[in-house]
Amino acid sequence: MSTPLTSSLTSSYSALASQKILVTGGGGFIGKALVLALRDLGAEVRVFGRSRYPDLEALSIPCFQGDICDQEAVRRAVAGTNCVFHVAAKAGIWGPRSEYMAINHQGSRNVLAACTSEQVPILVYTSTPSVVFNRDNLCGADESLPYASRPLCAYAASKILAEQELLAANCPDLKTVAIRPHLVWGPGDTNLIPRLVERGQSGHLAMVGNGSNKVDITYIDNAVHAHLLAAENLLTSASAAGQAFFIGQEKPVNLWTWINALFTRLAVPEVQRRVPLAMAYGAGTLLELVHTLRRRQEEPRMTRFLALQLAKSHWFSHARAEQLLGYRPLVDTASGVDRLVAWLAATTPC
C-alpha cells in the first residue's frame, strides 16, 4: 500500500497476521502493494512471478521465480502456505488469444490444482469487472449481472473462464472468493495512468462519445484493502465464500472530467477532441482486422473494446462488499489524486 497500515486497520485483518501467504504476480502493481501490506501486518509472505524482484528480496521476502503455466513450479510455490492471493495475469486488450488463455485460464487452473493438492484452505482471486461488460451501459450494476456472453477481448474472455472455475471450486476444504476492482490507479501504477498521460501528451487521446459517461475507479490502497478483507472473511465467518465482489471508490466519476482534472494537475493538455462512438468502434474493427492479418504484435491505437470502455458508463454497486466484507474506501478520490500527483512529481525525471 502507498501508506502504512494504521493500528485500527490492522485489527480488521487480525486473522491474516498469523498466516503463511503466497501472492502470485507479486511484482505487479496490485500484487506488490498487497505483498507490502501483508508484510506490514506481520504475515509470512512469499511471491511467485516470472522475474526476480530484487526490491522484495531486499526486504527478505522469498521470491519463487517461475511460469504460471508450469504446474509443478506453481505447486512448489504454494507448498507450505495456508492462504493464496492469485493476482498474476496477462492484462491488456490486445495479443494472441492463446497467451491470454494459457496465462489467465490455465494458469488459474494450476493455482487451483496446487491449492487442492497442498491442502491450502483459502484462495482469493483478483478478477475484473470486464467479465460482465457486454457492450451496454452499466449503472449501479450488482453481482447478479451475468457474465458477458460476447466478450470483445481475449483478456475478458480468459478472466471469465478463470473466475467461473475458481468460484465453482469453492468448498469447505478450499474457500474461494473473487475481487473485481475497477480501473486501479495510484502510486506505483505502471500501466493505466502512464498510458493515459503518454496519449494525452502526444495528442492521441480523444473523447469518445458525448463525454457524459461515468465509471468506477479504484485507488490502489482500496483495492488492497478489499483483498485483505476478503481473506480475513474466509478465515473467519466465510460468509463471502464462493462469491464475487465489485470494488471501487466512494462514488463513480465522470470519466473525461476526471481525466482532464488530472491532466491539469500534471500540466498535460486537456482532452478536447471528440469522436463519435460509431466512428471509434468502426476504426477499432478495422484496426483489429489489419493487425490480425498482418500479425502485428503492438496494440492497435483503437479497438472495439476500448471504444466502448471510453464511451459507455460502467460503475457498480458495492453493497455486497460493504455488507459481507465491511468494505469502505480507505482513501477518497481527491486524496488519492493528491498522492498520485506527489508520487509522479517525485519519480518522473526532470
Regions found by a protein language model. Give the residues of each.
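Mid/C-terminal beta-alpha module of Rossmann-like enzyme folds, strongest
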Residues: N233-P300, D338-V341
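Substrate-positioning beta->alpha
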Residues: L161-A162, D189-R195, N210-E232, G242-F246
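NAD(P)H-binding glycine-rich loop region in Rossmannoid oxidoreductase-like domains
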Residues: D55-E57, I61, Q65-Q106, A114, ...
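Amphipathic terminal alpha-helices
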Residues: S2-L9, K20, F316-L324, R328-C350
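Conserved Rossmann-fold NAD(P)-dependent oxidoreductase catalytic core, especially the SDR/UDP-sugar
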Residues: N110-A154
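Catalytic helix-loop patch of NAD(P)-dependent Rossmann-fold dehydrogenases
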Residues: N137-V184, L205
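N-terminal Rossmann NAD(P)H-binding glycine-rich loop of SDR-like oxidoreductase domains
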Residues: I21-D40
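Conserved C-terminal active-site "lid" loop/helix of NAD(P)H-dependent oxidoreductases
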Residues: I220, A244, N260, A283-T292, ...
